[in-house]
């Protein structure tokens, strides 16, 4: 059964509202890290500043730090050298050691866009494959909320981008220690 998104209440300037019939396939990526689920989750969230490349942001210049606030409604944001902050999205589900869901509040033009009705969504699951081995499954979905052209464009970009980000994450997760 296909999940459909309601079209935005009003279409953004220069962009058509997404018809209910549009469906854009989600991006699914996974990686196995040699650490337990609690540590894997902590590195992905509290430790994001250590693995998210500081040159991969949408703000004014390089990222000074990346933060995911640890609660539903918390922000995922970057702070830049000039002190400005750019919101990447908001936490929708926070289940430590198991699952994280965040809105991806970035337009296809790689600008912040706080309109929730246009946001895609990133879900990350942490699945134990042993006491010190975790499979991390990432699904980036709901691109159709952006409209056909913008949604397909964003999907193409993140389909190519998430593998490298997960490799950066895996390197950090593999480091010794049990907390970020």
Task: Say what each PLM segment does.
Residues 2-9, 141-180:
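A conserved amphipathic terminal alpha-helix motif
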Residues 2-63:
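Hydrophobic ligand-binding cavity/cleft-lining segments
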Residues 29-31, 88-93, 119-128:
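Hydrophobic/aromatic beta-strand elements that line small-molecule binding cavities or substrate pockets
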Residues 40-44, 76, 91, 102, ...:
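Hydrophobic pocket/interface hotspot
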Residues 47-88, 179-180:
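Short beta-edge strand/loop motif at the mouth of beta-sheet-based domains
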Residues 80, 104, 138-140:
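Residue-level recognition of conserved beta-strand positions in structured domain cores
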Residues 95-100, 131:
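Short, conserved beta-turn/loop elements at beta-strand boundaries and strand-helix junctions
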Residues 110-163:
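Beta-strand/loop substructures that line and gate deep hydrophobic ligand-binding cavities in soluble
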């Amino acid at each position: 059964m296909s999940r459909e998104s309601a079209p935005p209440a009003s279409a953004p300037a220069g962009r058509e509202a997404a018809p209910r019939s549009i469906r854009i396939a989600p991006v699914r990526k996974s990686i196995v890290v040699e650490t337990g689920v609690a540590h894997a989750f902590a590195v992905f969230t509290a430790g994001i500043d250590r693995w998210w490349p500081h040159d991969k942001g949408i703000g004014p210049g390089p990222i000074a730090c990346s933060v995911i606030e640890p609660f539903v409604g918390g922000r995922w944001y970057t702070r830049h050298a000039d002190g400005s902050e750019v919101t990447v999205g908001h936490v929708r589900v926070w289940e430590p050691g198991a699952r994280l869901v965040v809105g991806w509040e970035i337009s296809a033009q790689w600008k912040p866009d706080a309109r929730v009705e246009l946001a895609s969504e990133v879900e990350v699951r942490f699945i134990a494959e042993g006491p010190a081995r975790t499979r991390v499954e990432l699904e980036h979905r709901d691109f159709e909320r952006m409209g056909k052209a913008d949604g397909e464009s964003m999907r193409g970009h993140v389909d190519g981008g998430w593998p490298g980000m997960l490799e950066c994450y895996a390197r950090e997760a593999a480091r010794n220690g049990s907390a970020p």
